[in-house]
């Protein structure tokens, strides 16, 4: 399976490419919509600033709506309606607003337990690696699949159809993260 990793040109996507390869995919870097049209699935990685990433990601909205998509950290945040960071608009795939997190330490860095609240073929409960200063507050929403508890609850994963977003970094989450990527690939092949 060929998986296109969107390159926002503002961060390192090497660990995502390596994790996809370890999970059995053939990862390729995509910088344009035309290139993305030739892949089987898409990854919106979690690197860069919201403003810079959104400028490129909005070109990929139709691709995200059509192809299996895994959005990681910043990639997941781009799927929401808006963000406090950079005062930016989001892609509006999911309802919600990205805000600066309330936690004892910001950014939230490290392994945190992720609580799953609805059945998912892809998201499993357990410890994942987080690195973020912004997030979406937990609330009632059928797409919200998992949460992380800091000073408040924040969305850890969203899911609707073929679109999956995770606030954590599966590519840095050891075996647990690799298994999540494998499950994403298995579902994407259907």
UniProtKB/Swiss-Prot annotation:
Matching Gene3D superfamilies: 3.40.50.880
Keyword flag Amino-acid biosynthesis: yes
PANTHER family noted in UniProt: IMIDAZOLE GLYCEROL PHOSPHATE SYNTHASE SUBUNIT HISH
Gene Ontology biological-process entries: L-histidine biosynthetic process
GO CC list: cytoplasm
Pathway involvement of the protein, from the record: Amino-acid biosynthesis; L-histidine biosynthesis; L-histidine from 5-phospho-alpha-D-ribose 1-diphosphate: step 5/9
Gene: hisH
Keywords of the record: Amino-acid biosynthesis, Cytoplasm, Glutamine amidotransferase, Histidine biosynthesis, Hydrolase, Lyase
Residues the record marks as active site: 73, 169, 171
Assembly with partners or alone: Heterodimer of HisH and HisF.
InterPro entries tied to this protein: Class_I_gatase-like, GATASE, Imidazole-glycPsynth_HisH
Role, per record: IGPS catalyzes the conversion of PRFAR and glutamine to IGP, AICAR and glutamate. The HisH subunit catalyzes the hydrolysis of glutamine to glutamate and ammonia as part of the synthesis of IGP and AICAR. The resulting ammonia molecule is channeled to the active site of HisF.
Domain (Glutamine amidotransferase type-1): residue spans on this chain: 2-190
Protein name: Imidazole glycerol phosphate synthase subunit HisH
Matches recorded under PROSITE patterns: GATASE_TYPE_1
Location(s) in or outside the cell: Cytoplasm
EC number(s) recorded for this UniProt protein: 4.3.2.10, 3.5.1.2
Catalytic activity: 5-[(5-phospho-1-deoxy-D-ribulos-1-ylimino)methylamino]-1-(5-phospho-beta-D-ribosyl)imidazole-4-carboxamide + L-glutamine = D-erythro-1-(imidazol-4-yl)glycerol 3-phosphate + 5-amino-1-(5-phospho-beta-D-ribosyl)imidazole-4-carboxamide + L-glutamate + H(+); L-glutamine + H2O = L-glutamate + NH4(+)
